[in-house]
Swiss-Prot record:
This is Septation ring formation regulator EzrA. Belongs to the EzrA family. The gene is ezrA. It is a single-pass membrane protein. The chain crosses the membrane at residues 8-26. Residues 105-189 form a coiled coil. Residues 27-574 are cytoplasmic. Its main location: membrane.
Amino acid sequence: MPTGTIILIVSIVIILIIAYVACLIVRKRNDNLLVALEERKEELFNLPVNEEVETVKALHLIGQSQVSFREWNQKWVDLSLNSFADIENHIFEAEGYNNAFRFVSAKNAIDSIDSQIDLIEEDIASIRQGLMELKEQEEKNSGRVKHALNLFDSLQEAVRENPDSYGETLSELEKQLKNIEVEFSEFVMLNSSGDPIEASEILDKTEEHMIALNQIMDRIPSLIERVTKDFPEQLEDLESGYRKLVEQNYLFTEANIESQFQNIRVSIRENTALIVSFDLDAAEAENEGIQAKIDHLYKVFNREIEANKEAVKISKNLPKFLEHVVQNTQLLDEESQRLNATYLLADSKLSRINQLKARLESIEIVVTESVEDIENPQVAYSILEERLDHSLASLKEIEEEQLVLADYLKSQELSENTARKKATLYINKLHTLKRYMEKRNLPGIPAEFLTNFFRTSDHVEALIAELDYKRINIEVVNRMLENATYDMNQLEELAYLIVQNATLTEQLLQYSNRYRSFDESVQKAFNRSLSIFEKDFDYQAAFEEISFALETVEPGVTERFVRSYEKTREAIRY
């Protein structure tokens, strides 16, 4: 057999083998796909749809919910009886095509089965979702109805067990509860007749009515209690208290008390009507207004009661205090007249004493009338208390001013005595200072000292002359005494300084002898200092001249002499 023929035969055999192997591979793949599709079908078929259908069926749905359930149930029946059977047949056909190596037909059949299963999967998902929604909606509706019924029962129970808490609103509340009961009946009828949408709307409206009524019923008892109990009790208490106060001769700053009682009664009746009409916000606001009116009257009465107590308390001591202040003013007046003969008293002080007398006369009238009015008042006690308080404050103010005026009058004689004693003392001091300076054996008295001495002497003599007037002006005397005292102190300090400078100059001049023989600057300073000392009598300049020269040759010498002098300085003995 030719080689070419052998090669051809071998090639054909190889191709056939390859083709056969390829066919086996394709068939195996298709088998796997068909197995997977079969498994998907079984998974879908085994889903608990039947159980879910039975669960929803057991709810005994009505109306539109029942129609929806029937549609989902029928769809599931169609799927379970027809669609799954069709898929089973198609899988069987595809297996036949695959076993017969009709791969194109098998591929088309497999794709078709896959699409069918996808559609069934979607349908089952929608069926289950629909069933779940029906179940949830039914549970929700059932819960809503149960909650609404419970709320309705609680409202009825509240009205039944506490009718007094709702007062005149009871009939209106019962009417509203009857309307809600009718709405419930309408809801049940519509729901049973298969109109759940309209029934749901009725239930929504019923719930809104019950919630609103519940809120109203929560607020009514406190409002009713105030208009039927609290306010009437407070008003009765006010009227009773008012009658007692009037019997005790109380008067009031407000003349329309009884008309205010009547206005409060009218407000209570009007507010009751607001509560009955369920205008509760307005009723609460009106309640606050009524309470404010009642509180105002309590405040008025309490104010008069407290004012009476305070007025009685003040009246016990005020007349005595007034008498005390009047006596003090009389004493001030008498003392001012006595002193005015000897002293020139300030017109402002005398005028103020007269003003206090006039002011006390008016206060005395007010106090007398007010104290008498306490037993048989002609005005409200609050007015009496205000008058007495004002009078008491005025008397305290006057008393403080009296103390100031008394100190002023007392100071006249004290100031005169002080001035006379100091004038005598200053005369003696001048003589002593004069003798003190003369005993120093100074070459001469500095002009500054003489000027201060004669000025001080003139001031003291002027002070003595002022004290010799028939009527002394103490203000002028005090100013002159102040000037004389200042001059006297200055003169004394100047005397000490002059004597100190003169003494130290003499000591330093003597001490300079140890340097004059060999130090020309010390000799010159000695000559200048001695000349100033003996001719100019400027002891300060003489001291500075010699001390400067000695400090040059012996630092610290001046300070040593000064310290020594201060320890042994002779004091002026007056």
